[in-house]
C-alpha cells in the first residue's frame, strides 16, 4: 500500500509509481528489458491491447501533483522552481506530504500536464485516468485535460482524490479540484470518503468499527451516500463510492481488526454488506 511508502527518502525504492521521475516513460517493471526504451513502450502497449482483447478497461493512476525530487526534476533544472510551488520563505510547498507540490496553475506546467495525459490516451489507449491528490491541481487544468482528451476519445473517464490539502498557490484566484468544487469540473469524479468511513470506520483509527462491523452511524449520512452526496457532488456521477482501495488495509483485513471475535463466515457477510452499499449507491 502506498501509505507505507516514505516518499521523502532520497534512496531508490519500490514506490508503486508515486515517485514520479518522467511522466511520459513507462515504468521498467512492465518490460522484459527495462534498459531499452523501445521495449518499455512496445510491451506496455502490448499489455494494454491484451487487456482490451480480454474485455478489460485500463485506467491509469497518474501522479501529477508532485515529483520525486523537486530540485532534481528535469523541468526545474531547466527553469529553476517553475514546475513547483514555492512559499515566500523559499521552501517547497508540501500539501502532498511528498516534499513538493506541482504548480499546475502556471501556463506551461498546465500545457505539459495536458499534453502528457493526451499522450497516454493517444498512444497507449488508456480508458481512464485516476488522479492522485487531484485537489492539488487547479480546476482550469482539469477541465483543459478532459476537453483535450475528449476531442479524440469521448468515452475516457476521469476521477481522483479531492481531499482538501493545504498548498502555496503561485497566483491569486486559483480554484483547486477539491470535492466541494465539483461544479467547476463537470464530468470529473471524486472519491467519497464519507461512505468509506461510514462502512468500515474512520481511516485515522485502525480499530474503530464502521457500520458493517456493528457501529451505530448516522442514518441521514448513509442516505446521503445513496443519493450521490448532494452536499458536494454537483452530479451523482461525480461521487465515486467505495469501501477499499490501494491505501490502508483491505476491507476484509479492516473487518478483522474491528470485529476480531466474529467468525470468518460473519466477516464475509460484513464484507458483502459493504459491497452492496457502494454498488447500489448513486
Predicted stretch roles:
Residues 66, 137, 166:
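Feature marks short, surface-exposed loop/turn motifs that line or immediately flank catalytic pockets
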Residues 146-282:
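Conserved alpha/beta catalytic core and glycan-binding cleft of carbohydrate-active enzymes
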Residues 2-124, 134, 142-153, 157:
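Substrate-binding/active-site clefts of carbohydrate-active enzymes
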Amino acid at each position: 500500500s502506498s501509505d507505507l511508502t516514505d516518499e521523502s527518502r532520497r534512496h531508490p525504492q519500490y514506490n508503486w509509481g508515486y515517485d514520479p521521475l518522467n511522466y511520459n516513460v513507462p515504468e521498467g517493471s512492465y518490460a522484459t528489458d527495462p534498459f531499452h526504451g523501445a521495449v518499455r513502450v512496445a510491451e506496455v502497449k502490448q499489455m494494454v491491447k491484451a487487456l482490451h482483447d480480454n474485455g478489460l478497461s485500463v485506467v491509469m493512476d497518474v501522479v501529477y501533483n508532485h515529483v520525486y525530487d523537486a530540485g532534481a526534476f528535469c523541468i526545474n533544472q531547466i527553469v529553476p522552481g517553475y514546475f513547483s510551488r514555492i512559499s515566500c520563505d523559499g521552501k517547497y510547498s508540501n500539501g502532498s506530504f511528498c516534499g513538493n507540490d506541482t504548480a499546475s496553475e502556471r501556463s506551461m506546467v498546465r500545457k505539459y500536464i495536458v499534453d502528457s495525459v493526451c499522450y497516454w490516451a493517444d498512444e497507449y489507449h488508456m480508458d481512464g485516468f485516476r488522479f492522485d491528490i487531484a485537489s492539488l491541481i487547479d480546476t482550469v487544468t482539469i477541465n483543459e485535460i478532459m476537453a483535450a482528451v475528449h476531442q479524440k476519445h469521448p468515452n475516457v473517464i476521469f476521477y481522483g482524490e479531492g481531499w482538501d490539502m493545504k498548498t502555496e498557490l503561485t497566483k491569486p484566484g486559483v480554484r483547486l479540484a477539491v470535492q466541494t468544487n465539483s461544479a467547476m469540473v463537470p464530468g470529473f469524479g471524486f472519491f467519497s470518503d464519507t461512505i468509506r468511513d461510514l462502512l468500515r470506520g474512520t481511516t485515522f483509527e485502525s480499530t474503530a468499527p464502521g457500520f458493517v462491523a456493528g457501529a451505530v452511524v448516522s442514518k441521514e449520512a448513509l442516505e446521503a451516500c445513496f443519493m450521490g452526496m448532494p452536499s458536494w457532488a454537483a452530479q451523482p456521477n461525480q461521487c465515486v463510492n467505495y469501501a477499499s482501495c490501494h491505501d490502508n488495509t483491505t476491507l476484509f483485513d479492516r473487518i478483522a481488526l474491528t470485529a476480531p471475535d466474529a467468525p470468518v463466515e460473519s466477516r464475509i457477510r460484513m464484507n458483502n454488506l459493504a459491497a452492496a452499499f457502494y454498488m447500489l449507491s448513486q
